């Protein structure tokens, strides 16, 4: 039922009998009690939208009001001149900070809910003032002049950015600083307003502003602590004021330094990793490249030595890239320390090479150590070849082109090694040793063939991601002999082998071949001494024989020779201490 229809049904000239002191008058209300609320407008104000519009068309205008006259206080019988006033959501009128409760969402609607689309906060039923969450103030001992709806009305704001303040007057003929509904402010969100006399004295008064009201100053709310901090009166400078300014800026500076410190170290770390790895020669900076040329010109006895020399030149480059930053300097020094340890026992660094050297061995036979090495099958001669490797190549015809992979009789097994050190020594001494269970299986296979066909072993290092070669089993297992050359002393037994292929073949070349005797898993996902059926073994041997490799363990043969010498010296020292 619209307000315009109610105007035609109600007579004029009857006063309101309902007071604001008590709201428990459900049964005693008459239709004449609401005459002041719905009477025709004596002084219409065309600046506001008519109340008959259910959905306010000017919802997003800077300010929205209702066309009630000032002489007829709509919901108050105390003669107050409050008028309903609503503001648009988040509207700033005169550039003032919007720190006061907004009238659009700060007042309760029907049954205490939020008004819908800017509708006024009165209840839908005129007799339902007792449902107002803020209207029942009979127990507060306040004046009876204010009604349950007094907190829902506000005077037109002047310079508070569309916020609502009770008791404000926007017209010159109205009394300033008059807030009749202050008894309900303590109970609602509308009470959030400036309550400090010092703030009121420091802020200039504006017509219609209730900042300087004495009745409002008693209502201090904790949430209004921010505005006084920003508009506090000037005080003489003291050490506390001076210290407070750096205190606000200092965390930001520390945060920036922290961010800069955390973002700057990665480039030098990556730069040093490029220098220290076996694969990359370090073409990033000029200083490492010069050191690399010097290392190539020196006589090479082992691969770790150039790495250590090259790593010692890396910290100045890292420091130069960082500049005057002092925080990123500590990370680079441990790297030369680690590489110096690797110069003595380069086990950690060496095991990085098999996995990543595919990108570092495309430089005309020069590996990541900066030492000229011959790639297997490439035909190039090393600048400083190792004598042991040259002797092995002269005796054995590695990677033959006329290999007969189409076997009529024979057996093939997968061999998984713990490290490339053992692969190096197997090639060097032409022997191998498996686990106790593996030795029995290989020995039985060799004896079952009885010379009718070969027993091939497909070697792969755990975690390397490639097969490193193929060897043929040449003798039965001797269980009573310990070779004593392996990187670990737990292996017992020995049998002779002859290496045929020494090349790195990635698992991606062989992953499509699956073994029906191993749950149909790829041949690359096999355990030690896993037998490969003959038909599948032919496919594997064909791929390995025809694969054009770029890397092999021969590229790091000098490195493993040095490692073996170091291990043997350590064993001799232990034996000398034991005696």
Curated annotation (Swiss-Prot):
Source taxonomy: Eukaryota, Metazoa, Chordata, Craniata, Vertebrata
Gene Ontology MF, one: RNA binding
Region (Localization to mRNA processing bodies (P-bodies)): 2-384
Biased composition (Low complexity): 337-349
Segments of this protein annotated with the region Disordered: 1-45, 247-387
Subcellular location: Cytoplasm, Cytosol; Cytoplasm, P-body; Cytoplasm, Stress granule; Nucleus
Amino acid composition bias (Polar residues), ranges on this chain: 291-316, 372-383
Protein name: YTH domain-containing family protein 2
Domain remark text: The disordered regions have the ability to interact with each other and to 'phase separate' into liquid droplets within the cytosol following binding to mRNAs containing multiple m6A-modified residues. This leads to the partition of m6A-containing mRNAs into membraneless compartments, where mRNAs may be stored, degraded or used to transport mRNAs to dendritic arbors in neurons.
């Amino acid at each position: 039922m619209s307000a315009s229809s109610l105007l035609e049904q109600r007579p004029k000239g009857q006063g309101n009998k309902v007071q604001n002191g008590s709201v428990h008058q459900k049964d005693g209300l008459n239709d004449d009690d609401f005459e002041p609320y719905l009477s025709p407008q004596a002084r219409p104000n065309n600046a506001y939208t008519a109340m008959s519009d259910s959905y306010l068309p000017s919802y997003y205008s800077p300010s929205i009001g209702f066309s009630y006259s000032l002489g007829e206080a709509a919901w108050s019988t105390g003669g107050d001149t409050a008028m309903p006033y609503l503001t648009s959501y988040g509207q700033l009128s005169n550039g003032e900070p919007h720190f006061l409760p907004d009238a659009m969402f700060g007042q309760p609607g029907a049954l205490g809910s939020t008004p819908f689309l800017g509708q006024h906060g009165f209840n839908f039923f005129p007799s339902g003032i007792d449902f107002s969450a803020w209207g029942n103030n009979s127990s507060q001992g306040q004046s009876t002049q204010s009604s349950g709806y007094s907190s829902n009305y506000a005077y037109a704001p002047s310079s508070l950015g569309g916020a609502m303040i009770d008791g404000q007057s926007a017209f010159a003929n109205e009394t300033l600083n008059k807030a009749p509904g202050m008894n309900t402010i303590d109970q609602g969100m509308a009470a959030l307003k400036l309550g400090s006399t010092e703030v009121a004295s420091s802020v200039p008064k504006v017509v219609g502003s209730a900042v300087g009201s004495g009745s409002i100053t008693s209502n201090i709310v904790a949430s209004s602590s921010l505005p006084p901090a920003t508009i506090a009166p000037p005080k003489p400078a003291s050490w506390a004021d001076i210290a407070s300014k750096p205190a606000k800026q200092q965390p930001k500076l520390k945060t920036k330094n922290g961010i800069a410190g955390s973002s700057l170290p990665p480039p030098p770390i990556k730069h040093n990793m490029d220098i220290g790895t076996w694969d990359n020669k370090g073409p990033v900076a000029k200083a490492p490249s010069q050191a690399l040329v010097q290392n190539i010109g020196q006589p090479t006895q082992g691969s770790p030595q150039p790495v250590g020399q090259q790593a010692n030149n890396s910290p100045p480059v890292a420091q130069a890239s960082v500049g005057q930053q002092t925080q990123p300097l500590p990370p680079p020094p441990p790297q030369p320390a680690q590489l110096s340890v690797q110069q003595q026992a380069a086990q950690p660094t060496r095991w990085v090479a098999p996995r990543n050297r595919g990108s570092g061995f495309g430089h005309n036979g020069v590996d990541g150590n900066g030492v000229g090495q011959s790639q297997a099958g490439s035909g190039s001669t090393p600048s400083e070849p190792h004598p042991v490797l040259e002797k092995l190549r002269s005796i054995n015809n590695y990677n033959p082109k006329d290999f007969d992979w189409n076997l009529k009789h024979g057996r093939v097994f997968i061999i998984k090694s713990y490290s490339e050190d053992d692969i190096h020594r197997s090639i060097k001494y032409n022997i191998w040793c498996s686990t106790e269970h593996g030795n029995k299986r290989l020995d039985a296979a060799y004896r079952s063939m009885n010379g009718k066909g070969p027993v091939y072993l497909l070697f792969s290092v755990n975690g390397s991601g490639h097969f490193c070669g193929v060897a043929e089993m040449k003798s039965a297992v001797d269980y009573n002999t310990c070779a004593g050359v392996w990187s670990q002393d737990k292996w017992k037994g020995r049998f002779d082998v002859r290496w045929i292929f020494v090349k790195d073949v990635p698992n991606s070349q062989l992953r499509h071949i699956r073994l029906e005797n191993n749950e149909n898993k790829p041949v690359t996902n096999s355990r030690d001494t896993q037998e490969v059926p003959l038909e599948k073994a032919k496919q594997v041997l064909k791929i390995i024989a025809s694969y054009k490799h770029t890397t092999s363990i021969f590229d790091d043969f000098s490195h493993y020779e040095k490692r073996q010498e170091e291990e043997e010296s350590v064993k001799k020292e232990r034996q000398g201490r034991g005696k």
